[in-house]
């Protein structure tokens, strides 16, 4: 099989490749990573932990502003944990996480005049952020009510951004595996992804299977590149399969 992982598809899926290497002939990753930060300054760790646990609730606007300042996990390894903690905290503390609204904002944001009143009402009155577009409603559809959102609320807190995170040993095991991985390993990332921009550097040149492959840094596509760059992704994956 050919593995393709984006976002959690890489965080979870790459460790699946580690556990079942015989099932995969090649690997393709896009806008994802396999973070392993074992040398983060203890002051930063303490600051992030205190922020996570201080009991203050974040609004959507504050969280979105913090994420907009990120330069990507591969470009700012020391600053990323604090910025990403805003996302972790918002998701964990928001019982009715606005999944559909957030997805439409990241993929194809509605006009500002439609969005701004909703965000302001949410910030000052606590009203729910409901999806505006058919795309947003489609992403909201899998959740009949807020009780079904516990998974996506908890998952950001499982991203191992600190050396104290519980998945550290599994990440070490995964990197020990991929540092010896000789099967084709192709990276397809985007220049405008605020979350994982720069993470391709952790793979290219370190994973033996990346050598000699036509890795791509696509000019645009946001975080969910499969929404905007599906033709480029499909062509690159098809070419990799036919040539290897």
Language model regions located:
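Flexible "cap/lid" subdomain of the alpha/beta-hydrolase fold that forms the substrate-access gate
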Residues: 1-4, 8-217, 226
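Catalytic active-site module of serine/aspartate enzymes centered on a nucleophile-bearing elbow/loop
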Residues: 211-244
């Amino acid at each position: 099989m050919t593995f393709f992982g984006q976002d959690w598809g890489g965080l979870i899926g790459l460790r699946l490749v580690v556990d079942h290497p015989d099932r995969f002939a090649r690997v393709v990753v896009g806008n994802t990573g396999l973070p392993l930060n074992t040398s983060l300054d203890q002051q930063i760790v303490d600051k992030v932990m205190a922020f996570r646990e201080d009991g203050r609730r974040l609004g959507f606007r504050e969280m979105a502003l913090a994420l907009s300042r990120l330069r990507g996990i591969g470009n700012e390894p020391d600053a990323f944990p604090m910025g990403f903690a805003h996302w972790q905290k918002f998701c964990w503390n928001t019982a009715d996480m606005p999944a559909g609204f957030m997805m439409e904002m990241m993929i194809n944001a509605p006009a500002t005049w439609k969005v701004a009143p909703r965000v302001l009402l949410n910030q000052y009155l606590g009203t729910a952020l409901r999806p505006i577009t058919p795309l947003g409603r489609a992403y909201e559809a899998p959740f009949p009510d807020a009780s079904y959102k516990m998974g996506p609320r908890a998952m950001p807190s499982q991203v191992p951004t600190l050396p104290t995170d519980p998945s550290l040993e599994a990440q070490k095991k995964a990197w020990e595996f991929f540092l010896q991985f000789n099967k084709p390993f192709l990276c397809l990332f985007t220049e405008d992804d605020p979350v994982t921009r720069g993470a391709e550097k952790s793979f290219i040149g370190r994973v033996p299977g990346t050598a000699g492959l036509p890795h791509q840094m696509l000019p645009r596509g946001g975080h969910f590149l499969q929404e905007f760059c599906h033709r480029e992704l499909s062509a690159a994956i098809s070419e990799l399969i036919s040539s290897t």
